[in-house]
């Protein structure tokens, strides 16, 4: 029997989606399909063609297709969802949640129809609630629906620590629990530089400053750009997750996972350390938390549930 080429479909051809498609192609993880709405089919095809024409120079052998038709996504191994709208001035949180939940449902129906065995990674904000929506709509098992936030937050944290210590980012490890921004729970006790606990290398006030900058990381970039938000680091984070699944790497990564009793919580998607491999989220890693970490995580859970309360009722 012929060996099937791997396929990764990216839904949403904006800055993050297009950059994700390019990074997946550069890693030669499989053929790439970039999908957007019919009104954006021209630009989507143009971006995909531009990427495809770069492959001979980069020495990667993949097909890259731009389309508005989900037919091209048939039998995808992994589907990455970046589609959705950003919050606009005057838009309420409930409006944002409701609108993006509607988009998630429409996209998920197409994914289930054309790729019933796919693993789905969700980036669309608010990511915890949107991942939950995709999980419920798809009917897929929890290990095959995964959200992205912690990989990005951890990458930012590692970057800032490496800059502070003037060390290679490769030697910096760290973890965060919970959601993005102020809801992030930094696990400094599990953060190291070359195997040395961070607390042995930096004074507490510098660690606190790095944590705060990490929490505000997305906002810092928004402020500098003036229009738009981060997309290189989010795309790199998504590509890392796709690679972990397709290569069955058994990576220990913080992802948005469905909890069924872990950490004492039920029926919620939230950021926790996981083992990510060929069967998606293969395990949620439960860490012993201090009372302070438990309290901060509980606050993060409360915030996620608050956002989920704005999801349209069935």
UniProtKB/Swiss-Prot annotation:
EC numbers on record: 1.1.1.37
CDD domains reported for this sequence: LDH-like_MDH (cd01339)
MF terms in GO: L-lactate dehydrogenase activity; L-malate dehydrogenase (NAD+) activity
Keywords from the named record: NAD, Oxidoreductase, Phosphoprotein, Tricarboxylic acid cycle
Top-level taxon: Bacteria
Residues annotated as the enzyme's active site: 180 (proton acceptor)
Residues noted as binding NAD(+) in the record, renumbered to the chain: 12-17, 36, 100, 123-125
Modified residues (Phosphoserine): 149
InterPro entries (alphabetical): L-lactate/malate_DH (IPR001557), Lactate/malate_DH_C (IPR022383), Lactate/malate_DH_N (IPR001236), Lactate_DH/Glyco_Ohase_4_C (IPR015955), Malate_DH_type3 (IPR011275), NAD(P)-bd_dom_sf (IPR036291)
Residues binding substrate: 87, 93, 125, 156
Pfam families on file: Ldh_1_C (PF02866), Ldh_1_N (PF00056)
Catalytic activity: (S)-malate + NAD(+) = oxaloacetate + NADH + H(+)
Family statement drawn from the similarity comment of this UniProt entry: Belongs to the LDH/MDH superfamily. MDH type 3 family.
Function: Catalyzes the reversible oxidation of malate to oxaloacetate.
Entries under PANTHER family matching the protein: L-2-HYDROXYCARBOXYLATE DEHYDROGENASE (NAD(P)(+)), L-LACTATE DEHYDROGENASE
HAMAP family linked: Malate_dehydrog_3
Name by which UniProt lists this protein: Malate dehydrogenase
Organism: Halalkalibacterium halodurans (strain ATCC BAA-125 / DSM 18197 / FERM 7344 / JCM 9153 / C-125)
Organism taxonomic ancestry: Bacteria, Bacillati, Bacillota, Bacilli, Bacillales
């Amino acid at each position: 029997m012929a060996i099937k080429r791997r396929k990764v479909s990216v839904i949403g051809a904006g800055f993050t989606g297009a950059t994700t498609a390019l990074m997946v192609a550069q890693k030669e993880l499989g053929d790439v399909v970039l999908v957007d709405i019919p009104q954006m089919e021209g630009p989507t095809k143009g971006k995909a063609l531009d990427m495809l024409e770069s492959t001979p120079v980069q020495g990667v052998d993949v097909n890259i297709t731009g389309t508005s038709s989900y037919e091209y996504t048939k039998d995808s191994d992994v589907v990455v969802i970046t589609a959705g709208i950003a919050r606009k001035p005057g838009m309420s949180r409930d409006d944002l949640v409701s609108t993006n939940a509607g988009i998630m449902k429409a996209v998920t129906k197409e994914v289930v129809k054309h790729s019933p065995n796919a693993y789905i990674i969700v980036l669309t904000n608010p990511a915890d609630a949107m991942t939950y929506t995709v999980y419920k709509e798809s009917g897929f098992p929890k290990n095959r629906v995964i959200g992205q936030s912690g990989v990005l937050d951890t990458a930012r944290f590692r970057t800032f620590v490496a800059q502070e210590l003037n060390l290679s980012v490769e030697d910096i490890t760290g973890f965060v629990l919970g959601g993005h921004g102020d809801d992030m729970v930094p696990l400094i006790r599990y953060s190291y530089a070359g195997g040395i606990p961070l607390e042995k290398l930096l004074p507490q006030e510098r660690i606190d400053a790095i944590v705060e900058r990490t929490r505000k990381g997305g906002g810092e970039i928004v402020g500098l750009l003036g229009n738009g938000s981060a997309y290189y680091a989010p795309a790199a984070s998504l590509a890392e997750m796709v690679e972990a699944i397709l290569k069955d790497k058994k990576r220990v990564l913080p992802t948005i996972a469905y909890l069924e009793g872990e950490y004492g919580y039920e029926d919620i998607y939230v950021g926790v350390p996981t083992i990510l491999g060929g069967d998606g989220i293969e395990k949620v890693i439960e860490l012993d938390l201090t009372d302070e970490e438990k309290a901060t995580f509980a606050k993060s859970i409360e915030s996620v549930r608050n956002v989920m309360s704005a999801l349209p009722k069935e």
